[in-house]
Curated annotation (Swiss-Prot):
Keywords tagged on the record: ATP-binding, Cytoplasm, Kinase, Nucleotide biosynthesis, Nucleotide-binding, Transferase
Catalytically driven reaction(s): AMP + ATP = 2 ADP
Pathway annotation from the record: Purine metabolism; AMP biosynthesis via salvage pathway; AMP from ADP: step 1/1
Protein name listed in UniProt: Adenylate kinase
One of the GO BP terms on file: AMP salvage
EC annotation from Swiss-Prot or TrEMBL: 2.7.4.3
Residues reported in the UniProt entry to bind ATP: G11, A12, G13, K14, G15, T16, R127, Q173
Assembly: Monomer.
An annotated Gene Ontology molecular function: ATP binding
Amino acid sequence: MPRLIFLGPPGAGKGTQAERLAAIYHTPKISTGDLLRAEVKAQTPLGCQAKVYMDAGELVPDEVLIGMVKGQLQHSPAQGWILDGFPRTLAQAEALEELLRELGQDYDHVLNLEVPDDVVVARLLARGKEQGRSDDADEAVILKRLQVYREQTAPLIDFYEARGRLRRIDGNQPMESVQEHLRALLEGFRRTA
């Protein structure tokens, strides 16, 4: 079963593609956003820790996120997993590598969905209107998110490329085309493994 990490700017389609692959391969999709919401709602110790930061409008510390991800990775080693929204920083990527070594696991591929900024802005503005998401309805907020992505997450491309695990995917095409490309890529790797 695949063990995948999705990267790409906001609005690239990471969540959509990760969800589709998770359904096809019967593999858990691990989304840090979903994890945070679930842990906070369940009032777990990690959720209570995270809530303090979230309520203050601050980023949840890496050690809290790593704790949540660790719990999920321990539950599904044989099924594989798909990480969506994690890691977002070099420090998180390094912590994930250490965690995977500790768990005796590894990842197969890092799938980087590449989409030009103007397309990202257009997609997010459309999503903001359709879904009423305030973080996607304001172009200034979107541009700030892209800036944060370039500063914090884009360095992961070099990190994973240096490890020979990065796969660049043209995310500037219809969802179905991206999905077909991803499936062909993964099937090709399964045949050669």
